[in-house]
Every structure is written in C-alpha cells, then in structure tokens.
C-alpha cells in the first residue's frame, strides 16, 4: 500500500511538472493555409551566413526551423539556389569580406545541412562559389566530399537520376528527385551544376521527355537564370569556366522545349538596396503554350549588404494547394519569428513577397 501511495504521489508530481511544458507555445507556430496542402521551402544563397563566424548561427536557425516545421507545414523538401560557401578553395582571410577559410565554411555549411539529414531531403543547385578557388572560374569543387549521397537517408527513395559533375565524379550536383502527392500527382525536381554544360542540359531534357517522366510536373533549379528586379535572363557572364550555359541558353536549350518544366528557381544575382533588388519573377509560355513560372530569390545581401548578417533569415514557403495547380508563395524569416519582440516583422507582405503561381494543366 505504501508503494502504491508513493507511486501515485510521484505520478501527480510528474503530471504537474509536465503540464506547463505542454501548455507552452512555439514563438511563432506555423501552419498551412489549407491543411490538405504540402510545402517545399526555398532558401536563397546562404554564403553570407557562413563567411563570418558571427553570422553562422543564422544559417543553422533556418535549417533547424525547417526540420522543426516538417509536420506542421507538411514539408516535402528543402530547395537551395546554391553558393553554400563564399569560396571553395582559399586559405587567405580577407577581413573586408570574410573571416573563415574555405574549409571552415564548408564544415559549417555541412553542419547546418546536417539538421535535415534523416528528416528531409534537401536539393541543392550548386553555385559559382562552390567551384574553383574563389569565384567559380575553375571546374573543381569540394561539394561531393561534404555531400555524398549516403549522408542523408531521405534521398534513398526519391533520388531517381544523376549525371557526373565537371570532374567526372558521381555527385548530386546534377540530380533528379521524384515526389508523389495525391493532389498534384507526380513531381520531378531537377537540380543542375553551376553554369551547366550542354551535356547536363541534354541529360535533363531527355529525362523530362522520357516516357517515365513525361507526365510529371517538373521543377528545375539552377544558380544563374534571372537578374534582379528586371527578371531578364542572364547571359554571357564574366567567368572563365567553360563550357557553360546561363539563363538565356538554359531557357532556349532546356526549359522552352520541355513541355513539363513549369517552375524554374534560381539565385545568384542581386545588389544592395531594397528587398526588390534581391528578387525577381516572370512567366513565359514554353513550346507547348504552357506557362512557366521563373523565380529568383537571393538573400545574401539582405540584412546589411555584402558584409551584413547574411540574409536576415529570409526564406520562402511554397505551399502547394490541394487544387493541384496553385502554389502560394510566402516570404518568412525564422530569425524575426523566433522572438515575440520581432514577430510582427516575420512575414513580408509586399507584392513581390506573397503571390500565387498558377500551374494550369
């Protein structure tokens, strides 16, 4: 009897301690506008976070937020537009633009993405700063060393195709991932290397046109495709890496001919100034007369310019509505959302920040 009384008292104590914990609320709990939707999270170029040690926790906050909101937002994948690091292979610190070596930046980027390993697939279109010594002029990269396919178990079931990188190595620099959702059918997300070679575009085109994937809705992610504000397509950029294709050629050789590529995501461009100087958007019809949404989102100079905090934590929630053709775009910052003091600034509400993309059959 004494033991039973002791057990009951202990149970009551634990219950009383647990109640306040269960009653607590997240700083800024997220939810979908429709509970039957699913989402993908778009993160712009994170290089500004990793190049200064003081900025680095902001990148981890973003990836941790994605992992934490997996169920609430029914997140299927995290998409990145490239430039995980500021410099691929450099040991000389330029205090005017960074205080981390390339190895330190790669290690931190890997650490932050590790928040998603085993939780969510993440799909990265590598940028110019992942290649060469400092800016993407040469073809070598450390990307496959830090992101081998074995590191994230969530890739196992959705990775369906890959193409060798510029060094002839097997890598997810050029990779395709398949998702199946009741309301949207089958989706194919393809990521391509920095300034993709013709053979990469040929691989992606043949994949899209193949019998297996011809009826999929395709999302294509590449680093350089649109300029900020004007949304003009990039062309003939001043990099020594060859062969190379930029926005105009990618449109002509891949996106326009493929009837099922309906969304293109990119980063890369931008200039200090207003938020509008870090984003752009346009729609054009492809060869089949179907609209193709094209969106540039690059956070690196938000939060204080080139030497600021790396992006203020801004990311985009892409909510795929249950009608099977509407994608709601919302621009959100976990950095502002995590504190009640700044929560009112966590969502941007301008015309370029929240809008609908309609993907008609």
What are these regions (language model features)?
Residues 307-361:
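A short C-terminal boundary segment appended to hydrolase-like catalytic domains
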Residues 36-39, 72-78, 117-123, 182-188, ...:
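Loop/turn elements at helix/coil->beta-strand transitions in domains of secreted/extracellular proteins
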Residues 90-202, 213, 257, 274-296, ...:
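Extended active-site neighborhood of metal-dependent phosphoesterases/phosphodiesterases
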Residues 42-44, 76-83, 121-127, 192, ...:
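Active-site neighborhood of phospho(di)ester-bond hydrolases with catalytic His/Asp-centered motifs
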Residues 24-101:
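N-terminal active-site segment of His-dependent metallophosphoesterases
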Residues 95-102, 198-202, 211-262:
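Active-site-proximal segments of metal-dependent phosphoesterases and phosphodiesterases across multiple
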Residues 37-50, 185-195, 221, 293-298, ...:
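Active-site-proximal beta-strand elements of phosphoester/diester hydrolases
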Residues 242-322:
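Conserved beta-sheet core of the metallophosphoesterase superfamily
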